[in-house]
């Protein structure tokens, strides 16, 4: 019985020691968790902190997760700006390229109008002679502009141009030929003048793309060379 009592007492001591060690370990773990909890919270921006409690939404790792998502979304939005900028630059380059192609396809010839040198566009896509309001101002033809006869009639014009008047007697010299023709005045800032299909037919014009010549005249034909298609506006501005 004596030995049995000693063994029992020894077992109790061992059990007590194990329980004490377990309690110490639990306290250390609790302290470690509290430290991590507090340390993680301290690393967060102050404006993102709430009173930390038992709610999962207010735990540090959840707040950090939300912050990470917000940061990623912010980065995603910021990366869209350069892409939009690239798209705009691409569209601008594309538009400039199309405009350049259109300019290169234009046929221009030198002529005189109101005693001044002008680059006239040979426009087979329009029935009428067109002169811009800017060109009217440059040539001093404002007094010759009259209201459009058929105001209710909408002329079929390229580039959605708006007719603001007409000139009944516009004197144009092409080569050695003098023309007395009508022209519709359009609201346009470019200093341009164009010869429409009606006038080209009346002159029996032939467009020779191989020789870059506009052949005019019914009997005594005359060849008018094309001029470089830099820009109608630039050409006529330089002559002002």
Curated annotation (Swiss-Prot):
CDD domains in UniProt: NRIP_C
Molecular function via GO: aspartic-type endopeptidase activity
InterPro entries reported for this sequence: NRIP_C, Peptidase_aspartic_DDI1-type, Peptidase_aspartic_dom_sf
GO biological process, one term: proteolysis
PANTHER family: ASPARTYL PROTEASE DDI-RELATED, NUCLEAR RECEPTOR-INTERACTING PROTEIN 3
Protein name: Nuclear receptor-interacting protein 3
Biological source species: Mus musculus
Gene name for this UniProt entry: Nrip3
């Amino acid at each position: 019985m004596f030995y049995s009592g000693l063994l029992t007492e020894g077992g109790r001591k061992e059990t007590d020691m194990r329980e004490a060690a377990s309690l110490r370990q639990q306290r250390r773990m609790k302290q470690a968790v509290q430290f991590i909890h507090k340390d993680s919270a301290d690393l967060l921006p102050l404006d993102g902190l709430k009173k930390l409690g038992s709610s999962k939404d207010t735990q540090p790792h959840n707040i950090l997760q939300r912050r990470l998502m917000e940061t990623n979304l912010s980065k995603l939005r910021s990366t869209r700006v350069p892409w939009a900028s690239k798209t705009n630059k691409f569209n601008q380059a594309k538009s400039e390229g199309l405009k350049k192609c259109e300019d290169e396809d234009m046929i221009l010839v030198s002529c005189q109008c109101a005693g001044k040198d002008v680059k006239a566009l040979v426009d087979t896509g329009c029935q009428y002679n067109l002169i811009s309001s800017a060109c009217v101002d440059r040539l001093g033809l404002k007094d010759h502009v009259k209201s459009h006869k058929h105001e209710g009639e909408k002329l079929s014009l390229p580039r959605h141009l708006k007719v603001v008047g007409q000139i009944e007697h516009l004197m144009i010299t092409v080569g050695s030929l003098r023309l007395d023709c009508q022209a519709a005045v359009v609201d346009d800032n470019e200093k341009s003048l164009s010869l429409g299909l009606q006038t080209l037919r009346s002159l029996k014009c032939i467009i020779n793309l191989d020789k870059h010549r506009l052949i005019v005249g019914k009997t005594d034909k005359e060849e008018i060379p094309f001029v470089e298609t830099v820009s109608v506006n630039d050409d006529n501005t330089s002559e002002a």
